Structures are given as C-alpha cells and as structure tokens.
Curated annotation (Swiss-Prot):
GO terms for biological process: taxis. Belongs to the asfivirus MGF 360 family. InterPro entries: ASFV_MGF360 (IPR002595). It comes from African swine fever virus (isolate Tick/South Africa/Pretoriuskop Pr4/1996). This is Protein MGF 360-13L. Plays a role in virus cell tropism, and may be required for efficient virus replication in macrophages. It holds the Pfam family ASFV_360.
Length: 353
C-alpha cells in the first residue's frame, strides 16, 4: 500500500519539524497524524524508527507503537505504522476484535506469534525502566489471552536472573503474579513513583514485597519509612539475610544489623551468593563465621573464597560505629567508606600473584 503524495510530504515535514504551529496541528489532525492529543512525529535513534508522542512521556519504538494502536483498535494508525515499517506480526500480541484481526491479515500478519517474538517484545518494552514503560508493559501483557503459555519459560528465566536471591520461583506460580512482582521490583529499583502508585492501586497485597525489594535494592530511606512509620515488618534476621543476597548492599545490611539482625547469618548468606563486597563488610561489622563460611564455599566450589576464609588476617573495623539507626547518618558515614577487610584480602591476593 502506498501513501498519498500529500501525506508523504506531510510526514516528511513532521519528521523534520521540531515545533509545529497551531495551523499545522489542524492539518495533522485532519490527516491522521495525531495521537492522544499530541502531534505524531517520527525520529531516528541508533538507526531505529521511534514515535515521538506525549502520552507516555517518552519516545517509543515503532513496533511497540503498532501494538498500542492495535490494542486501541485504531485502524488508521495501524495502517500508517505498518507503512512506516512496523512489523505487522507484532500486532498479534494485542488483537482484540475479529475486524482488527482481518485487517492485520490483509497487511500480512501470521496467525500466531512465536515464543521468541513475544519475549523480544517484552524485553524491548522493558529496556528503558520508566514508569511509562512499566505501566505499558502491564497493560499489554497482563491477562493477555493472545499469550496463553507463550514465553513462560523464558520469562521465568529472566525474572530469576534479574531478581536472583529476592524471589524463589515455583512451578505452581501463576505467570501474572510473577509479572506483577517483577514490574514492582523494577519500579522500586529505578524509583518509578508513578508505576509504584499504579501497581499499588491495582494490587493491595504488595506491602511485604515492597519491603523485600527495598532491602534487596539498598533503599535505606524508603526502608526506614516502611519499617518504622508504616509498621510493615518481617523478622529482622530474615531482613538482613535478604539484604545480603545482592552484592554491595552496605546500607541495608548495616540498617538491619543496627536493628538486631545476626551479622554472621548475613555473612553466610553473602558467601552462599558469592557477594564479595557484602562478605567483607560483614566481617568489618564483627562477623566471624569463618569455619561455617569456608564449608559453604568449599561445597559450592568457591576456591578463592574458601582459601581466603582460612586465613587468620581479618578482624572487625574499630572505626565503624555500631549504633547508628538514622538512615541519614548511616548513609553519610558509609558514603565514602572503604572496607578494611576487603582491602586486606585484595592486598594479600596482589602479593601472592
């Protein structure tokens, strides 16, 4: 299908224009180059066509724009985005009427999407961790009958990799539940406040999951707010272990230790996940579970760690105050802190190599 010459000219003008006059807006509306109350514009980013449109607050990939247009049953934009180069098979992810399905067939769409295609779309949308992307991903994938059991194995693998130590995935876990937890965790990690509010309005049982995410992503200020002011609490020993499953989490490890968390348990958890920064920070705080830690390291084949923990060269750091409980004070003190015991093991390793 070819575009009318006047539309071709208008598209070129839209692509090239940075600022459009009110008169031009009227023309754009008349010609269908208008979406969600703003002008529709094209731009290029690293050789990829992007749609500049205001409703997400950011540019979106042309293929993703097609998925949205199909979900909205927007016939004219489906055709336009396809003419501009959008892969018509992506439409299969959001088709919700037989009329749209027939249109997409006419434009060359297959009958079904491959698992790899679905997973590729998911990762493409989630590439930029913003509130708009998280909410969009939720709108497209949540309770989507076009997906059925597609890409479940790949998605489980992705969540397990990105949230290693934070979540245990069981075979009985529902896909929708895993998706909500993944999106919420990403919203907490990247401080996407609109997405957090959006998900909390839809799902009312996220308080404990949020606390776990704050521990995992080293968010001490929000953790303090939830624990002391909102009174969302779990066992402090579980908290310090969870903080230890992701490396370089001194803020939340210290915070939980100040609350009474077992620093040796944190040390052993850090060893289990091979989190070097956490291990030696725990020793700085007084952790001394060397024999148990060495046994775990040997069992897992962590040879360097097993050898290191057998050395009699470590001790707690006397310069570390052990009674700070205010997140501002903890953050300020640890901002430029260099682990005493990590420095010792690096120096030892350098000398023997």
């Amino acid at each position: 299908m070819s575009l009318p010459l006047s539309l071709q000219t208008l598209v070129k003008k839209t692509v090239a224009s940075q600022c459009l006059s009110i008169d031009e807006h009227c023309i754009l509306k008349h010609c269908g180059l208008w979406w969600h109350d703003v002008p529709l514009k094209l731009c290029m980013d690293r050789g990829q066509i992007q749609i500049k449109s205001g409703f997400l607050g950011e540019d979106i990939d042309l293929h993703i724009a097609l998925i949205i247009a199909v979900k909205e049953n927007n016939y004219s934009l489906i055709k336009l985005f396809t003419e501009w180069g959008a892969h018509i098979n992506y439409s299969l992810l959001s088709i919700n009427t037989e009329h749209i399905r027939e249109l997409c067939r006419q434009l060359g769409a297959k009958e079904t999407l491959e698992d790899d295609d679905v997973f590729r779309i998911f990762t493409k949308i989630m590439h930029n961790k913003t509130s708009g992307r998280i909410i969009l991903c939720h709108d497209i994938f949540m309770n989507n009958p076009n997906i059925e059991n597609k890409f479940t194995i790949q998605l489980r693998g992705l969540i397990c990799k990105r949230l290693w130590g934070l979540i245990e995935i069981k075979e009985t876990d529902e896909l929708n539940d895993l998706l909500v937890k993944y999106w919420y965790a990403k919203a907490v990690q990247y401080e996407c406040k609109d997405a957090i509010c959006f998900l909390e309005e839809k799902y009312t049982d996220l308080n404990e999951w949020r606390l776990k995410c704050l521990l995992y992503f080293n968010k001490i200020y929000e953790l303090h707010e939830m624990y002391h002011k909102e009174k969302v609490q779990i066992d402090v020993h579980d908290m310090i272990c969870l903080a230890s499953t992701k490396d370089n989490n001194p803020l939340t490890i210290y915070y939980c230790y100040a609350l009474g968390g077992n620093i040796n348990q944190a040390m052993l958890t850090s060893i289990q996940y091979y989190n070097i920064g956490n291990i030696f920070f725990c020793i700085d705080l007084g952790g001394n579970a060397f024999e148990e830690g060495r046994a775990i390291a040997e069992q897992k084949g962590y040879n360097f760690l097993s050898h290191s923990l057998a050395l009699d060269i470590f001790s707690s750091d006397a310069s570390l105050p052990l009674n700070l409980k205010d997140p501002e004070e903890i953050s300020s003190f640890l901002k430029d802190y260099k682990s005493k015991n990590l420095s010792i093991i690096w120096e030892y390793s350098h000398n023997i190599l």
